Amino acid sequence: MSALALAPVPAPTPSWRTDRLPQLRARVLGGGPTGALTALALAQAGWRVQLIDPLSGSQLQARRRAYALSHSSRMFLQRLGLWELLSEVAVPFRSLRLCDLEAGRAIGFGLDDVGSCGTRADGAEAVGWILQHQPLMQRLLEQLEAHAGISLSLGDVASPGGNAESSGSAGPQLPDLLVAADGSASPTRRSAGIRRWRLPYAQACLTAQVRLRGSAPDQAWELFRREGPFAVLPLGDGTTQLVWSAPAERLGRLEALDPVAFLDALATALPERLQPEALLERPRAFPVALELARRFHRGSLALVGEAAHRCHPVGGQGMNLCWRDVEELQRQALRAAAGELPPAAVAAAYGRRRWADVLLTLLFTDLLVRIFSNRQPLLLSCRRLALDLMARSKIGRAHV
């Protein structure tokens, strides 16, 4: 019997694991930091990628903004092979001072509070990093243009660099994956009929770059004030980025002040040891809201970054949350490229796995704003107690 036994018949291979596998294509709509990183991550997963944005490369670089990067973002960039390039322009901060000015409490976070995860690949250590928009986008665009698996269509003219779709094959063909990385107002999300929840804050946010005295060059500050959170982020060479949250009417008045009057107003908002010296750019105010798409996918469409969610800037969580979207999308794209997941299921798998992290982050930032902008006596007492306990607990500081 054994000699006549038939060999087991292998299960038929699904069609998506054969003829379509080498032709996996993605189209990314939106060329900002999240869209650019998405294109690079998908290309590294073996997909052919077309990146489309109505703005030109120079326009995409033109924003004056700074981002706080956490260790989760740094480790993801390392896996993509981008950290060595970006660390050249990322300013590390090795100390973070959290001050509750209403409760009269302050606590410091240093390298001991991040442990071994604070060690960068080049041997330097940091609590986090500050990365300005222009050098970030310059380097991401250079990587996009150099990648053979990526085609750029920026502005009104498609880029001749990147030969993946130069024959026009990505244009008329439907991609296996469509990624909306086109921001909070996302026309792609709206055209897909995906609604969102939106909760405007009573606060707005003002950003400016100033030169300060009294702060170490590698120290960041998170100040909790009665009118809202206030972050002071080091940019190197004595320059700092301010992220000032306050009622919109007040910020509108501050935005209209001349430089001398603005610095005088700024001095009253900062701790005494921080003395403003010079205003380096015109302050700009913008509204702040908590936003959450009601779903992160529809069919082969996946929403990433602010097309899917938006949180208050307190704690510098925004960019890190967006890039964790990219990391999860790449994880599912790798499964599809390996034949473990139908390409048509990538967006759905991504959407399911992102909900918990996004909801927790939005809840965390929202609670920070509501608790630390509240002068209710019981809450003030609780804040003092919480910060006192945290100051005495290394484990507590490590989990902030």
Where in this protein do the model-derived segments appear?
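Conserved N-terminal helical subregion
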Residues: 16-22, 75, 79, 85-191, ...
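Extreme N-terminal leader/targeting segments of oxidoreductases
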Residues: 1-27, 44-45
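Conserved FAD-binding catalytic core of PHBH/FMO-like flavoproteins
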Residues: 77, 177-284
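Conserved Rossmann-like nucleotide-cofactor binding loop
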Residues: 34, 57, 185
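N-terminal Rossmann-like FAD-binding beta1-loop-alpha1 element of flavoenzymes
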Residues: 24-51
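C-terminal helical "tail/cap" subdomain of flavin- and related membrane-associated enzymes
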Residues: 5-13, 331-399
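Glycine-rich FAD pyrophosphate-binding loop
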Residues: 43-65
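FAD/FMN-dependent oxidoreductases across multiple families
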Residues: 252-342
